[in-house]
UniProtKB/Swiss-Prot annotation:
It comes from Encephalitozoon cuniculi (strain GB-M1) (Microsporidian parasite). The 26S proteasome consists of a 20S proteasome core and two 19S regulatory subunits. The 20S proteasome core is composed of 28 subunits that are arranged in four stacked rings, resulting in a barrel-shaped structure. The two end rings are each formed by seven alpha subunits, and the two central rings are each formed by seven beta subunits. The catalytic chamber with the active sites is on the inside of the barrel. Its main location: cytoplasm. GO terms for cellular component: cytoplasm; nucleus; proteasome core complex, alpha-subunit complex. The keyword DNA repair does not apply. The gene is PUP2. It comes from the Eukaryota. Transmembrane segments: none annotated. This is Probable proteasome subunit alpha type-5. Keywords: Cytoplasm, Nucleus, Proteasome. Belongs to the peptidase T1A family. The proteasome degrades poly-ubiquitinated proteins in the cytoplasm and in the nucleus. It is essential for the regulated turnover of proteins and for the removal of misfolded proteins. The proteasome is a multicatalytic proteinase complex that is characterized by its ability to cleave peptides with Arg, Phe, Tyr, Leu, and Glu adjacent to the leaving group at neutral or slightly basic pH. It has an ATP-dependent proteolytic activity. The lineage of its organism: Eukaryota, Fungi, Fungi incertae sedis, Microsporidia, Unikaryonidae. The keyword Cytoplasm applies.
Length: 232
């Protein structure tokens, strides 16, 4: 039984791959990230875990720009995320050079889904890690319309109107289910998503311990701490 629990590419007698289940648990240990999609924009809002007053808040990054119209947020092992970000950026650039067009958000998701399942490759040149990714991702983008997806370590991805990942995801998703219809204008939506995030944060919310990005048809705008403070 222990062999099944250690193996990354063997099913147990119950039809489970335990290493993927462990990765699914790891992704919920990180700070909370919220994604909300409307007809005009997508917002990503994340808690930044500041461990010391001596720490530079700018050194903690929760959102990464993958391409002009695609942003990634995560919860879980940050080192895994950096590998995913690099691979994603390279893939998007390659797609544009090959086809002469911006990549669609779902095309990137399909690539990431296949990438997440390459942990058991015998060919080391193809293998990314020797274990599943220990992160859950939220992808916000705008191609023909606003897009919001979540991808878990099993390679499964789903489109959402609103989604939360991380340690506070259950509480946040309960709030989003009841209040999603109240998200309309950008200013109101920013205030609302920050208020929701504050309810699952151990520390008092401030401009330095949250990160916010807004994706529209025109741009992916990362709000400065001063801009965030306006909505707190």
């Amino acid at each position: 039984m222990e062999d099944f629990k250690q193996s990354v590419n063997t099913y147990s007698s119950e039809g489970r791959i335990h290493q993927i289940e462990y990765a699914m648990k790891a992704m919920n240990l990180g700070t909370t990230t919220i994604g909300v999609r409307t007809k005009e924009f997508v917002i990503l809002c994340s808690e930044k875990k500041i461990l010391s007053t001596l720490q530079n808040p700018k050194s903690v990054v929760k959102h990464y720009k993958i391409y002009d119209h695609i942003v990634l947020g995560f919860s879980g092992i940050s080192g895994d995320t950096k590998t995913i970000v690099k691979r994603s950026r390279d893939f998007c650039i390659s797609h544009t050079h090959m086809y002469g067009e911006n990549i669609s958000v779902e095309r990137l998701l399909k690539y990431l889904s296949s990438l997440s399942l390459r942990f058991g490759e015998e060919d080391e040149a193809k293998m990314i890690f020797r274990r599943p990714f220990g992160v859950s991702l939220i992808i916000a983008g705008f191609d023909t319309e606003p897009r919001l997806y979540s991808l878990d370590p099993s390679g499964s991805y789903i489109s959402y109107k609103a989604k939360a990942i991380g340690s506070g995801h259950e509480v946040v998703e309960g709030i989003l289910e009841n209040e999603y219809e109240e998200y309309s204008g950008l200013d109101q939506s920013l205030r609302k998503v920050l208020c929701t995030l504050s309810k699952v944060m151990k520390d008092k919310i401030s401009k330095d311990n949250v990160e916010v990005v807004v994706v529209t048809q025109e741009e992916s705008k990362f709000l400065t701490p001063e801009e965030v403070s306006v909505y707190l």
